[in-house]
Each structure stands twice: as C-alpha cells, then as structure tokens.
Amino acid sequence: AALVGAWRLRRAGERERALGIGTLGLAELSHLLLLWGAGWWALTALCETVRFVPYGLREHALLLVAAATVASWMLLALRERWRELALLCLALVPVALLALASAWRFDYQPFGEFGWLAWPLLFATHLLSLRRLAPLLPAKALSVAHVLGCWLLLGVLALELRYLFALLAEQYNAWRWLGWALVPSAYLLLVAGGRSLP
C-alpha cells in the first residue's frame, strides 16, 4: 500500500506543487512512503523466507527475491520515469553483500544449492538495471553501484574458486587460497586488455 501511495503522491506532486502536510510537499511524502514501502517489502520477504525456506537455501532464496523485486521496480521506474525508484534499485548490491556476509562460513560454496541460479540472475539484473536506468540516475550513484557490483562479482567468483581448490587440496595447503589470487589477476588482465566491459 505504501508503494502504491508513493506512486500516486509522486504523480499528484507533478501537477500540484502547493499541496502537502506542514513543511513536507507531496514529493517528500512520496519519498517517505517509497522508503517505508520498500522497508516493509524487505522485512516481509526476509521473514517469510526464514519461515518457509530451509536453512541452507535461505540466502540464495533471498537473492532470487531481491533480483525479481529489483527487476520489477526497474520496469516500473522506466515506465514512469521515476528517479527515486531507480535510485532504490541500486540497493541490490548492498543487499547481496549482506546475504553473502550472512552465508559466510569456511565451507560456503556460492554456486552450491540454488546459488548457480541466484548469483548469475542477481548479476544479470544488476547489470541490466545499471544499463537501462542510467538516464534516470545520478552519475556518482551509478559509478558507486558499478564499482560495488564489480567487487561483489570478483568476491563471489573468488569464493567459488577457493571452494573448488579446497576440495582438491589437502588441509593446510596453500593451493586452497589460489582462488583469491586468480580471479583478481584475471580481472586485471581483462581491464588492461583495453576491452570495454559491461
């Protein structure tokens, strides 16, 4: 209801600038309702995931819900030219960082369970939203989201490679940490090659 209220207030605020409550205009009320609705949506998704999804799948299920949510918000922001909702779509990477921190344990495999679906879908949604929402977003926010997404991608790939090397190596062997060196090195080689990356 708060998200719909934010949308209606935003549309009304474009026509009627003088209306509002106290010192808050319709645009500010729309921003507050948008944040309120997004907060409730996130809390509800978290509670229902904890309630219904088995323990080992929770983080990946939350990533799928977050990617689907941002994809739908992206479409709505594009259709309505809604800058605030487009800015809210950039919260996908911080949410993914929280999910990664929540799932962190020594034997965590990012592409295990449903991670093979959740992480690529999340990165595809992130890149698509960065590309499609670029005209609606401030350049600084777009740049920060791009850098955070790049670091998250490198971290997830390094974690997966570390897990695979840990399966091959014996305990107390340095090979298990090779993933942390190979992925950033490969990224630096790609960047140094002069190709334009997404």
Protein language model annotation of sequence segments:
Residues A1-P198:
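Alpha-helical transmembrane segments of multi-pass membrane proteins
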